[in-house]
């Protein structure tokens, strides 16, 4: 079962909820997992991972790593108006499928090209 996620890899998002100073921060989406509806955002939800050395070249120790955040806790930032917005998906007359900003009605990107 795949969940629809309103953000894609490379989008800029703002965190809606979080502990302490995390809420309201902006970051870039590094990875989207549609299976469980989570996203990994650059520089947010940092956790410390204790890692054992696996080979003579890999060092062990405590490393900082981004943990997944549920997609409902992030909101897309429109590249046109720069505000956090909801996403509208629309199919144009020529068959092209696009994502639109609900605040400024600007096109965010093309999901599927028009069929020829």
Curated annotation (Swiss-Prot):
CC annotations in GO: ribonucleoprotein complex; ribosome
Coiled-coil parts of chain: none
GO biological process, one term: translation
Sorted UniProt keywords: Ribonucleoprotein, Ribosomal protein, RNA-binding, rRNA-binding
Pfam families: ribosomal_L24
GO MF annotation, one: rRNA binding
InterPro entries, per the entry: Rib_uL2_dom2 (IPR014722), Ribosomal_uL24 (IPR003256), Ribosomal_uL24_KOW (IPR041988), Translation_prot_SH3-like_sf (IPR008991)
CDD domains listed in its UniProt record: KOW_RPL26
Family that this chain belongs to: Belongs to the universal ribosomal protein uL24 family.
Subunit details: Part of the 50S ribosomal subunit.
Function: One of two assembly initiator proteins, it binds directly to the 5'-end of the 23S rRNA, where it nucleates assembly of the 50S subunit.
UniProt name for this protein: Large ribosomal subunit protein uL24
Record organism: Acetivibrio thermocellus (strain ATCC 27405 / DSM 1237 / JCM 9322 / NBRC 103400 / NCIMB 10682 / NRRL B-4536 / VPI 7372) (Clostridium thermocellum)
């Amino acid at each position: 079962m795949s969940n629809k996620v309103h953000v894609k890899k490379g989008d800029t998002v703002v965190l809606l909820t979080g502990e302490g100073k995390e809420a309201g921060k902006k970051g870039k989406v590094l990875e989207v997992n549609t299976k469980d509806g989570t996203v990994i955002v650059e520089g947010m939800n940092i956790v410390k991972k204790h890692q054992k050395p696996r080979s003579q070249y890999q060092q062990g120790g405590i490393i900082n790593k981004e943990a997944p955040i549920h997609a409902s806790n992030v909101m897309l930032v429109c590249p046109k108006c720069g505000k956090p917005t909801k996403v509208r998906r629309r199919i144009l007359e020529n068959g092209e499928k696009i994502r639109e900003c609900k605040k400024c009605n600007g096109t965010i990107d093309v999901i599927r090209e028009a069929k020829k």
